[in-house]
Amino acid sequence: MEYRDKPSVAGGAQASFLGSAVRRRGVLTGAASLASLATMAPVAYAQEASRAGLQRPSEPFPKRGGSLRIGFGVTTAHFDLTQGGSASALCHMYNGLVRYNLSDGLRTIVPDLSSAWEISSDQLQYTFMLRSGVKFHDGVVFSADDVVASFQRIIAPPEGIVSVNKGIFSAVDKVEALDSMTVRFTLKAPRAYFMDLLADPANIVYSKKVLDENKGDLKKVMAPGTGAFQFKEHRPAERWIMERNPNYWDAELPYLDQIELIHVPAWTDRGTGVLSGQLDMSWNISRETWDEGAKRKAQFGANRLGNYGCYAVMFNTKRGPLADPRVRRAIHLAVSRQDMITAFETQEMINLTRWIPYGNPLATPSDEISRLPGYRANKKDDIAEAKKLMAEAGYANGIKGLDFCVASVAAHAEILGPAFQDQLKQTLNIDCNIRITERALQIEDEQKGNFDIVLDTPGHTMGDLAVIGNAVFRTGASRNYGGYSNATLDGLLTQYEAATTLDERAQVASQAQDALDADPPWFLVGYTFHLLMWRNALKGLAFDYRAFSQWGRVETAWIDS
């Protein structure tokens, strides 16, 4: 199997996706999706460039200059993406080996720092030919050594370094440089989703020189990247400014002079900022401002995007009452998801979902979910069973003084957190004290286990059970901050990855979801939609037919002023 740029009979660029059959959020990539995209006229302009491993806007005749103003919560705990720094803020300065294609709405995977790749027939070896002429922002020439150093740090981080994506790369046996411009990944077992992992904006390539100089720890270092934009200014909790990289390896890009990432934590303020012209776009805004923008089609674009992020209250299973699975199961049963979703509906659209989100063919249908204990609207029997479990665990009279960590995002601290707090008190007499923490610093509390319960928005690279499970649910997983351990689930995840047919995977996935319901690591509120809005003057990002929500790079953007 291969992806290789080669001349076509007509002399143009032709990309071959031979047998790759990569799937992303239920959308076929490769030849099948390229054929379907031929019906989308605006995309045709950019297809040849994308196939050659270059990103181009879907509209012809892009204009140069100007600044793109993006509003969202742009804070980050530190500057190291591998250790959990904010990819949505930092990714613009970096590249990965591959990426999702901006010109077709993120439906296909195309080269980034690679120029071509080959996949062995047994799907155990992925060999990447690297792009020549690439330099980091400090002038250091990019090579295979940088790729090996970056991914080795993800897969087997040195002592004292936290790799948040270590778990999802657990199938990688080794990564090696075959020569200065060729890298090979060898897997322990085939993983159909491996290219999707590499395309995640967080899995970027750092300079080996900078990693070595800082002993692998870049938390306090604004490390030079290879990306289309380079660092200019950062005012914490206010804004980032990144300016055009004049030496970017793709000389056509970027069109913008700079991008401004403006810290707007409140979703209503983000939407109002776009509507008033103070912002050019926001990745996720409040429902009421999105509805207003959707009505004003001459001025604004709006899209509701499927998202593999969810709202969940994570349990610290290593201490106190939440160490008892009966208490966790009681909360799973007693709290009304319907009430939580309704309380939040003016802010964000949350779906009634189980542990596999919609968009994955193995997700439980909504009508079936609505009849399950814990998920059904009628809570009478669920609360009775929950109280029985609490009594068996020794908490018939409730629990006092749980530490409930909630981010300083207004909708979390003022709506969803208090709604969950009230439900615990009313149904099970569980008292918890809400502790507000800065959103960017919340991950550090989680990594240290400094919580009893924590409201967060865990996101995943894709909707596959193996990716989700290996990142957050498997014993010892790199993002399993609550210390959850379930031998039954671990075994099912291993079975799931070894399954070779859809029927086998469906059977094991169903058993895994049942195991999570019986012994939940979280209270899962539900997976969400993101409400994207932009001014119509913003071009080049194919927002109107984007396949899913990704708060990622924007180098093909241009302003039609």
Show which residues each predicted segment covers.
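Gly/Pro-rich hinge or "lid" segments in bacterial periplasmic/extracellular proteins
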Residues: T75, R99-D104, A199-E260, T268, ...
